[in-house]
Curated annotation (Swiss-Prot):
Pfam families attached to this UniProt entry: AMP-binding, AMP-binding_C
SS bond partners: none
Cellular localization per UniProt: Cytoplasm
GO MF term (any one): ATP binding
Gene Ontology CC terms: cytoplasm
Name used for this protein in its record: D-alanine--D-alanyl carrier protein ligase
Gene, per the UniProt record: dltA
Database matches in NCBIfam families: AA-adenyl-dom, D-ala-DACP-lig, PRK04813.1
Chain positions recorded as ATP binding sites: 156-157, 298-303, 389, 401-404, 503
Functional summary from the UniProt entry: Catalyzes the first step in the D-alanylation of lipoteichoic acid (LTA), the activation of D-alanine and its transfer onto the D-alanyl carrier protein (Dcp) DltC. In an ATP-dependent two-step reaction, forms a high energy D-alanyl-AMP intermediate, followed by transfer of the D-alanyl residue as a thiol ester to the phosphopantheinyl prosthetic group of the Dcp. D-alanylation of LTA plays an important role in modulating the properties of the cell wall in Gram-positive bacteria, influencing the net charge of the cell wall.
Keyword ATP-binding: yes
SUPFAM superfamilies: Acetyl-CoA synthetase-like
Length: 516
């Protein structure tokens, strides 16, 4: 455990650049970059950004994957006073366009080729970025992101079909980072050697880069091209000298498909941090068998409260006695309550909505006052957020999770609004009406997404089999929907059931799909 408190993220990184300039900060498949390089490259880019005369504090999109240039761009933008918006290069075109429409960025930094031409904003291409890094421009930090300034903006799924940009300030980030590097639950090692697998557009990434940069460690990036290829994934993981693993439970489930993923093969891997979706007893038990001495940490929290608000180290007793793992003890600076439908606090043991308050709560959604007003409020004098999650609190202060209150789900770590999936399905030329429904396994975890579909007149006659219709729909929507949002099974109906007030009966369909 670090027993250290940082006051400024950039100042901390700058100090490491002085104290350990030759120490690796980033290792992507053997390509190594040091703290000294990170300072030099981010200084050069920050100086260049100042010369562009962008609107002060305006957000900037950074487009790419797990490349080192992503991190260097983030640091440069923070130094020059700009919030950054990470967009993963595997994003669907329509999602990218929707983010640009909402965010109105002043600039795009394209670490990978940006798929949209004729933008209304300037674009720094990767070839230009390389030249900027080579210039080795010096930089005086005097208007960096600080205090309540927005540090980054992560876009999540939105109920209107438009993504919501969660604004996280420097103060929000410090609240999370200082808790993580000091909390007994995490027991974060000094100079952590950390797996960097979740994309930067997913706020779980903050759980690896923030503590690593705060403690002078090394990030070991694992690009999606590797994770998508089982053989390469297993070969690569076994060669990484990582001590800390941060991922969704789904990703470690994938890793455990290899018998070689164990403590004998990876003796240096001693810490596992999980967030982004529910860690089931089944997954935790299997991991404990593979890594008997490792620390398995279950963390919980919405993007809107800066990554996580509670955590605990899973014990053998929990694995023996719990049907559902507790989601942890809450951060000391973030009072967390359970409330009923009227907004009144509930006693310990009673289930209601989890409300988080305190300095890690976001200021709201970028350029979306209506959605901000609906989700964010003041509770007992502190900024607070409606998580939309059901939960209860034990007398010992342990938070228990009870599932989602609405139709928003977690699937493979991604937060998905079922309504957004349904809206996208309805954009297909073949579909008259469609809804998306999750199927849960016995561990209360989303197993897959199903689509109930009513086809347009004449479509069925165009194809020999239902499978061919499904293939055509998926091809039709490949530029509209992210891969993880695409239902794995399509069920074709003549009509969809309605509720008494004329809405599609999604709850009824969910019951049908999930009945024993």
């Amino acid at each position: 455990m670090a027993n250290k408190k940082i006051k400024d993220m950039i100042a901390t990184i700058e100090n490491f650049a002085q104290e350990q300039a030759e120490f690796p900060v980033y290792n992507i498949l053997g390509e190594i970059h040091t703290y000294g390089e990170l300072k030099a490259d981010s200084d050069s880019l920050a100086a260049h950004l100042d010369q562009l005369d962008l609107t002060a504090k305006s957000p900037v999109v950074v487009f790419g994957g797990q490349e080192y240039a992503m991190l260097a761009s983030f640091v440069a933008l923070t130094k020059s006073g700009h919030a950054y918006i990470p967009i993963d290069h595997h994003s669907a075109l329509e999602r990218i366009e929707a983010i640009l429409e909402v965010a109105e960025p002043s600039l795009v930094i394209a670490v990978d080729d940006f798929p949209i031409d004729n933008l209304q904003v300037p674009v720094i291409q990767y070839s230009q970025l390389e030249e900027i890094f080579k210039q080795k421009l010096s930089y005086q930090i005097n208007h960096a992101v600080k205090g309540d300034d927005t540090y980054y903006i992560i876009f999540t799924s939105g109920t209107t079909g438009k993504p919501k940009g969660v604004q996280i300030s420097h103060d929000n980030l410090l609240s999370f980072t200082n808790w993580m590097i000091n909390a007994e639950a995490f027991a974060t090692p000094h100079r952590p050697q950390m797996l960097a697998q979740p994309p930067y557009s997913f706020d779980l990434s903050v759980m690896y880069w923030a503590p690593t940069l705060a403690l002078g460690g090394t990030l070991f990036a694992l690009p999606k091209e590797i994770t998508a290829d089982f053989k390469q994934l297993f070969t690569t993981i076994n060669q990484l000298p990582i001590g800390v693993w941060t991922s969704t439970p789904s990703f470690v489930d994938m890793a455990m498909l290899s018998d070689d993923f164990n403590a004998q093969q990876l003796p240096h891997l001693t810490h596992f941090y999980f967030d982004g979706e529910e860690l089931t007893v089944k997954t935790a038990k299997k991991l404990r068998q593979r890594f008997p001495q490792a620390r398995i940490v279950n963390a919980y929290g919405p993007t809107e409260a800066t990554v996580a608000l509670s955590a605990l180290a899973v014990t053998d007793k929990m694995l023996e006695t719990c049907k559902r793992l507790p989601i942890g003890y809450t951060k000391p600076d973030s009072p967390t309550f359970i409330i009923d439908e009227s907004g009144h606090k509930l006693a310990n043991g009673q289930q209601g909505e989890i409300i988080v308050s305190g300095p890690a709560v976001s200021k709201g959604y970028l350029n979306n006052p209506e959605r901000t007003a609906a989700a964010f409020f003041e509770f007992e004098g502190l900024p607070a957020y409606h998580t939309g999650d059901l939960g209860s609190m034990t007398d010992e202060g342990l938070l228990l999770y009870g599932g989602r209150m609405d139709f928003q789900i977690k699937f493979n770590g991604y937060r998905i609004e079922l309504e957004e999936v349904s809206q996208n399905l309805n954009k297909s030329q073949y579909i008259a009406s469609a809804v998306a429904v999750p199927r849960y396994n016995k561990d209360h975890k989303v197993q897959n997404l199903l689509a109930y579909v009513v086809l347009k007149d004449g479509v069925e006659e165009q194809f020999e089999r239902a499978l061919d219709i499904t293939k055509a729909i998926k091809a039709d929507l490949q530029d509209v929907m992210m891969d993880y949002m695409m239902p794995s099974k399509f069920l074709y109906r003549k009509d969809l059931p309605l509720t008494p007030n004329g809405k599609i009966d999604i709850k009824g369909l969910m019951s049908e799909v999930n009945k024993k």
